[in-house]
């Protein structure tokens, strides 16, 4: 009898943290790989706040900038896999960086566990108001004639804006000097001030400034016009088919995070994107919202691997590598 009691106490002590406390019982840190005010940060705050309500715990934003998101993803990969540190990233941070950075100390596929696919964001071709071009064809002609005078901003090598630039260069035959920033928020401010002249930027970041008349939009890099900006033509409509890029986002946890916690976080993310108020906020920013089936961890993991297979040859062809 005493032996059974002792064994029961031992099992309770071992299982106590897992079964004695419901997850989550404290705030959750959400690592954001870019500066405050950029599109990834905005999405993290919108979705994270609603997920926090669903889970009954606050999401604390941790902006970790540098190396186009690789520093943030490295921090996430090294975090304790207990569900209290997760990260938001996108096509650039969690796919393209794996093809660009030769000396990453972690594996984007094997060291991070997908939680949920989040909305995707088409890109806008935008310039400062001082660029004298009325449409895409005039813009391309201007860029070719002034390649040595024009500079464009990105959120760093491998960022969504950098991916857009590579597709833009390939589809238009243009080239110009690239200026890396620690996020597109600061870059678009320099675009407004004409410190840089062009960006291929996520619509959620640029569209408010286009609407305010602070910058000019020429095309959206999608198959169809964006419902949030139906007056902006697609790149194909503007005369440049083949420039189609959407920056999808997602949530990840460190490898080793228990599956029941992954599923709990996924359910909270799905609930957040079903909320009509949240959907409207994201759609007003030009975001395309995935279905609950697309958001599931296993479906998202398969999609991430397929995207890596798609983009690695493109990156290799462009010769973009960072030691």
Predicted regions located by residue number:
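Hinge/capping helix and adjacent helix->loop/strand transition within the periplasmic-binding protein
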Residues: 78-84, 91, 99-186, 235, ...
């Amino acid at each position: 009898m005493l032996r059974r009691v002792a064994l029961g106490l031992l099992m309770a002590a071992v299982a106590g943290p897992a079964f004695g406390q419901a997850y989550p019982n404290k705030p959750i840190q959400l690592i954001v790989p870019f500066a405050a005010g950029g599109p990834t940060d905005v999405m993290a705050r919108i979705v994270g706040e609603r997920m926090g309500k669903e889970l009954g715990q606050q999401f604390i934003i941790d902006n970790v900038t540098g190396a186009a998101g690789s520093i943030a993803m490295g921090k996430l990969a090294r975090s304790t896999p207990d569900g209290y540190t997760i990260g938001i990233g996108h096509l650039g941070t969690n796919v393209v960086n794996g093809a660009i950075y030769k000396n990453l100390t972690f594996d984007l596929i094997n060291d991070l566990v997908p939680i949920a696919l989040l909305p995707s964001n088409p890109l806008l071709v935008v310039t400062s108001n001082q660029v004298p071009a009325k449409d895409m064809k005039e813009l391309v002609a201007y860029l070719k004639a002034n390649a040595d005078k024009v500079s464009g901003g990105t959120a760093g090598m491998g960022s969504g804006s950098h991916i857009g630039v590579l597709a833009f260069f390939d589809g238009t035959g243009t080239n110009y000097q690239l200026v890396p920033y620690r996020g597109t928020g600061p870059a678009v401010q320099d675009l407004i001030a004409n410190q840089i002249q062009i960006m291929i930027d996520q619509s959620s970041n640029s569209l408010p400034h286009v609407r305010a008349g602070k910058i000019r939009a020429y095309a959206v890099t999608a198959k169809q016009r964006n419902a949030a900006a139906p007056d902006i033509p697609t790149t194909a409509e503007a005369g440049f088919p083949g420039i189609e890029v959407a920056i999808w986002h997602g949530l990840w946890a460190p490898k080793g995070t228990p599956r029941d916690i992954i599923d709990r976080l996924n359910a909270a993310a799905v609930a957040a994107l079903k909320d009509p108020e949240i959907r409207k906020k994201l759609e007003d920013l030009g975001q395309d919202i995935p279905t609950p089936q697309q958001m599931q961890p296993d479906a998202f993991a398969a999609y991430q691997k397929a995207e890596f297979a798609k983009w690695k040859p493109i990156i290799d062809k462009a010769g973009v590598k960072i030691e």
